[in-house]
Amino acid sequence: MPSDRKILITGLTGQIGHPVARYLARDNEVWGVARYSADGSRERAEAIGVHPHVADLETGDYGDLPTDFTHLVHFAAWQGPAPDFDRAMRANAEATGLLMAHCRHAEAALIASTNTVYRPNEDPWHAYLETDPLGDPTAPHSPTYAVSKVGQEAVARTMARALDLPTTIARINASYGPNGGLPAYHCDAIAAGHAVLLRSPDQSPYSPIHEDDLAAQVAPLL
């Protein structure tokens, strides 16, 4: 794990971002940007040793956020239920470029994408490769999510070249842990009497990764 670094992490209030920030804050100065609009969200960040900073990634309003971060870890994402493609591109793709420009002096950046960028394979047990075809949304809860994350990857690749900023794009699949995750979402839906949304009416196998194991992968990815 990196140590004595100044790390900016987004998506801190999300299911994945919080445990990753907690892991990194053990030996680093970690700043977490979010709107912190929910009651107790700022205090929850401070409790794990993170410096909370209010920012709006979608508009690019960072306030007085420093620019001397050594590493950028970008987990924030917008997943809207409506087919608002303009907002999805602005929040997921354009926001990534603006954030990388703000952290242009960093040593490295980790941009979190998603497994839903892949075009569905006829074999539900297919193990996807990075070179597999992209496209065709597979996130039933958000019709704009997959296409906007493909756009995000394109923006991140362009900014990495333009800024000469070493960047890793990680296509993250299902995760779980005390902070929630896919199994918890399904259980919550069942308990509430709601339908569990699947990628297809056929088999939908997953291989969820625990949030602690995911956090341990951040250092190698950086």
Language-model segment annotations:
Residues 33-39:
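N-terminal Rossmann-fold cofactor-binding loop
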Residues 10, 33, 72-76, 109-115, ...:
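SDR active-site strand-loop-helix element
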Residues 87-98, 139, 143, 147-148, ...:
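Glycine-rich NAD(P)-binding loop of the Rossmann-fold in SDR/ketoreductase-type enzymes
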Residues 43, 81-88, 120-125, 181:
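Conserved catalytic-core motifs of eukaryotic protein kinase domains, centered on the activation segment
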Residues 97-144:
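Conserved Rossmann-fold NAD(P)-dependent oxidoreductase catalytic core, especially the SDR/UDP-sugar
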Residues 39, 50-91:
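NAD(P)H-binding glycine-rich loop region in Rossmannoid oxidoreductase-like domains
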Residues 123-125, 154-206, 211-215, 219-220:
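NAD(P)-dependent short-chain dehydrogenase/reductase
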Residues 7-27:
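N-terminal Rossmann NAD(P)H-binding glycine-rich loop of SDR-like oxidoreductase domains
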